[in-house]
Amino acid sequence: MTSRLQVIQGDITQLSVDAIVNAANASLMGGGGVDGAIHRAAGPALLDACKLIRQQQGECQTGHAVITPAGKLSAKAVIHTVGPVWRGGEHQEAELLEEAYRSCLLLAEANHFRSIAFPAISTGVYGYPRAQAAEVAVRTVSDFITRYALPEQVYFVCYDEETARLYARLLTQQGDDPA
């Protein structure tokens, strides 16, 4: 049986999946890193959708997620989540990161999405140590998919080879084949 969890090294904006997760900031207005890349690739329709969400509900809180159309991306939707800023690990960062992943998965499940692609949330300018963030991601997603049928396929999309190896090692340790 093929694992429901896979690691991909590459550009998340190029994937044809039901939902791409955006590691957003609270404003949802785009920024650096993967957030900026997703906004640039999706085009102005994504920014317009994010502006509408802000008008309706304000900023997106840490650990929460919202969904928008994907604009020019091959995905059906973009799920925007705000991960925690790393402040040394003593400020509920792990719990907030778990909540961010879980919020995305719940939106994917509610929208009947079969596939979802995650970047390494909070590991860029938010400073979350990659190894610790990867452990939270793999544990949270693995726990979720044991209880829910959807999404059927979850991709951890890593920008660099070192991060991809880290995720692959964690999946192998828990008995999943990451390829």
Curated annotation (Swiss-Prot):
Subunit structure: Homodimer. Interacts with RNase III.
Protein name, entry field: O-acetyl-ADP-ribose deacetylase
Family listed: Belongs to the MacroD-type family. YmdB subfamily.
Enzyme Commission identifier(s): 3.1.1.106
Cited SUPFAM superfamilies: Macro domain-like
NCBIfam families documented for this protein: PRK00431.1-1, PRK00431.1-6
Superkingdom, natural source: Bacteria
UniProt enzyme class: hydrolase
